[in-house]
């Protein structure tokens, strides 16, 4: 498949996403990155958002409730369409406007979650979910994606330690999450995505994970060209 070249305007944009199974450490990592941004006084040049949710858009919150509510009885394909619909709204309302302002957008989950959870976890197939999401997003992909990799057993231990009420997806069984993990492994080796995806050993402590991400960002050729780069690492 031919990969379209970015326009000059898109070359100046930086869209960074974070992926992984539940309790992989994305929330803690993003909190550290946000603190780093505040320390560098770059709040006005960065945006932090998430899926499904995105700055509490009422439309997306309605979809989120449908997807995650334990009382919902959704078919796998209905679930996939709901995620892609929420993603389109999120793009329109949060991601694209902030990228147009040349802000760095840090996002907790994006299309790769649909690939891992719906294409693999729900057995809908990669090509089908890729087609659906490319239609929904106009083939918008992140510039950099970090996949935080942990085992299902480690995920379960962390989730039990949190002692939080689990949503519909978090209640899925081992077999579902093993397929999701295989999905993330597939994405990391998929030729079209290899340049943007970096796998992080999320079994390490939070500081080690944070430092690993900072090093990748510091060495990343595209990030080096962004106006924020010098101040981000000053």
UniProtKB/Swiss-Prot annotation:
Q: Provide the reaction this enzyme catalyses.
A: dTMP + ATP = dTDP + ADP
Which UniProt keywords are present, listed alphabetically? ATP-binding, Kinase, Nucleotide biosynthesis, Nucleotide-binding, Transferase
Gene3D superfamilies recorded: P-loop containing nucleotide triphosphate hydrolases
Give the Pfam families listed for this entry.
Thymidylate_kin
Q: Which GO terms describe its molecular function?
A: ATP binding; dTMP kinase activity
Top-rank taxon of the source lineage equals Bacteria
Q: Which GO terms describe its biological process?
A: dTDP biosynthetic process; dTTP biosynthetic process; dUDP biosynthetic process
Record keyword rRNA processing present: no
List residues binding ATP.
20-27
Q: Which GO terms describe its cellular component?
A: cytosol
EC id: 2.7.4.9
* Described purpose of this protein according to its UniProt entry: Phosphorylation of dTMP to form dTDP in both de novo and salvage pathways of dTTP synthesis.
Family, per entry: Belongs to the thymidylate kinase family.
Name-wise, this protein is: Thymidylate kinase
- Upper lineage ranks? Bacteria, Bacillati, Mycoplasmatota, Mycoplasmoidales, Metamycoplasmataceae
Designated gene of the protein = tmk
């Amino acid at each position: 498949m031919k990969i379209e070249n970015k326009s000059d305007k898109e070359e100046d944009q930086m869209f960074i996403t974070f992926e992984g199974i539940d309790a992989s450490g994305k929330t803690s990592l993003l909190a550290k990155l946000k603190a780093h941004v505040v320390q560098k006084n770059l709040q006005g040049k960065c945006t932090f958002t998430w899926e499904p949710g995105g700055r509490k858009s009422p439309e997306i919150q309605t979809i989120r409730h449908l997807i995650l509510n334990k009382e919902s009885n959704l078919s796998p394909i209905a679930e996939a369409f709901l995620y892609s619909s929420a993603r389109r709204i999120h793009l329109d309302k949060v991601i694209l406007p902030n990228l147009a302002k040349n802000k760095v957008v840090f996002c907790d989950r994006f299309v790769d979650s649909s690939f891992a959870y719906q294409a693999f976890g729900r057995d809908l197939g990669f090509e089908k979910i890729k087609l659906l999401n490319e239609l929904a997003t106009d083939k918008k992909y992140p510039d950099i994606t970090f996949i935080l990799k942990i085992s299902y057993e480690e995920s379960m231990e962390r989730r039990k330690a949190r002692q939080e009420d689990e949503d519909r997806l978090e209640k899925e069984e081992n077999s579902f999450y093993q397929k999701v993990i295989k999905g993330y492994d597939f994405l990391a080796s998929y030729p079209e995505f290899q340049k943007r995806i970096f796998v992080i050993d999320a079994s390490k402590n939070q500081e080690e994970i944070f430092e690993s991400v900072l090093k990748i960002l510091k060495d990343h050729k595209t990030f080096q060209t962004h106006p924020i780069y010098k101040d981000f690492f000053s």
